[in-house]
Design a protein with these regions (language model features):
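Zn-dependent metallopeptidase/amidohydrolase metal-coordination segment
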Residues: 186-232
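Short secondary-structure junctions
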Residues: 35-43, 81, 85, 181-187
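Acidic/histidine-rich catalytic neighborhood of metal-dependent amide-processing enzymes
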Residues: 94-173, 182-183, 187, 194-195
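Active-site metal-coordination/substrate-binding segment of hydrolases
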Residues: 52, 56-119, 129
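A non-catalytic alpha/beta surface segment that caps or lines the substrate-entry region
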Residues: 15-58
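Single conserved hydrophobic/aromatic residue that forms the stacking wall/gate
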Residues: 1-7, 11
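His/Asp/Glu-rich mid-to-C-terminal helical/loop segments that flank catalytic regions of hydrolases
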Residues: 216-281
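Acidic, low-complexity, intrinsically disordered interaction modules
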Residues: 277-303, 315
Length: 325
């Protein structure tokens, strides 16, 4: 079983699925799933996959996205697996290349659970990385009989995302029922991903996004730490096994006016560009520099933007660039 599990990881990681060209990954999932008894597969016009296993009044649900950011993918690309990590490599070009573990790790977890459980729903979305295109056009009725939605689509090993862009994602009862703290996870807020798009379409059940063991996402130095991936799988299995009731939840946007999202996104674009040039600014600097331009944003908003930037581009990368230059 360990060998088969590792082999499945490597097969999945070799698949190249940039945004808008996810068909190879879709075909891999389709061929994998159709061998599992009692499974119904559907695909919508935009290319999202919907999978239902078993016949029940309510279902646990896992979602993930099919696409990846990396555009560098040599013909001899292979996934190298050691005892501890998985990374992409081109022997011909003698360089590391990104796995697309964001969100192939989520896909792997979803498919592992599909084999294990008799009752489960999965949804796989296209083009998350270019603006949640697939989830914004998802068939929302598919989720009507779901108890909750889990999305393994976060870097690292300890984050359980319960709020995105001031929108709460889950009820306190569901968060408590997950038992996440026993698995080393802690509650925090996150960035735009598919479950937020579902919430904005009116999804009325609890959702969370979980760290699933990938690091340095969106780069050619991306790696999967296998133990952290397995840690996420263990938490997902615990939630499926223990959260057997439906956990209703309506998103709450706390004290924000309509249009704040546009201003926040515009400010983030400008600040990201500034920090790309020089990382000498702190949160207070950014607030005083941009407050007159974006008056509806407060200090907490600037802290979110600052944190999001360094989540995507860790400080070590900037130090490396300085040394190289």
């Amino acid at each position: 079983e360990p060998y088969r599990r590792q082999r499945q990881m490597c097969i999945r990681d070799r698949i190249y699925s940039p945004s808008g060209k996810e068909w190879t990954m879709t075909k891999f999932i389709w061929d994998y799933v159709k061998r599992i008894p009692g499974v119904k597969l559907e695909i919508d016009k935009i290319g999202n996959l919907y999978i239902t296993k078993g016949d029940a009044e309510s279902y646990p649900c896992i979602v993930a996205h099919l696409d990846q950011v990396q555009r560098l993918h040599s013909k001899d690309f292979t996934a190298i697996e050691t005892e501890e990590i998985i990374f992409g490599y081109s022997s011909r070009n003698k360089r590391q290349e990104g796995l697309g573990a964001d969100d192939k790790n989520g896909i792997w977890i979803a498919l592992k659970c599909l084999k294990k459980y008799k009752i489960l729903k999965l949804a796989f979305f296209v083009s998350e990385e270019i603006g949640c295109v697939g989830s914004e056009k998802a068939v929302i009725d598919f989720f009507t009989d779901c108890r909750f939605v889990i999305e393994p689509d976060r870097k690292g090993c300890q984050d359980i995302i319960t709020e995105i862009n001031w929108t709460s994602l889950c009820s306190p009862d569901f968060l408590k029922a997950t038992g996440h703290e026993k698995f080393g996870y802690k509650e925090t807020d996150g960035m735009m991903t598919d479950i937020l798009a579902l919430k904005e379409k009116g999804l009325g059940i609890s959702c969370v996004n979980l760290s699933c063991g990938y690091y340095e996402p969106h780069t050619d130095h991306e790696v999967t730490v296998k133990e952290d991936l397995m840690g996420c799988l263990r938490l997902v299995e615990h939630i499926i096994g223990n959260c057997t009731e439906t956990y209703p939840h309506q998103p709450e946007i706390q004290g924000r006016r309509e249009g704040i999202y546009d201003e926040f996104d515009e400010a983030a674009d400008e600040i990201f560009a500034l920090l790309d040039q020089e990382d000498i600014w702190n949160v207070e600097d950014l607030y005083y520099m941009y407050h007159s331009v974006f008056p509806d944003l407060n200090m907490e908003d600037y802290q979110r933007i600052y944190t999001e930037y360094y989540n995507l581009y860790p400080m070590e990368e900037h130090e490396d660039e300085k040394i190289l230059s």
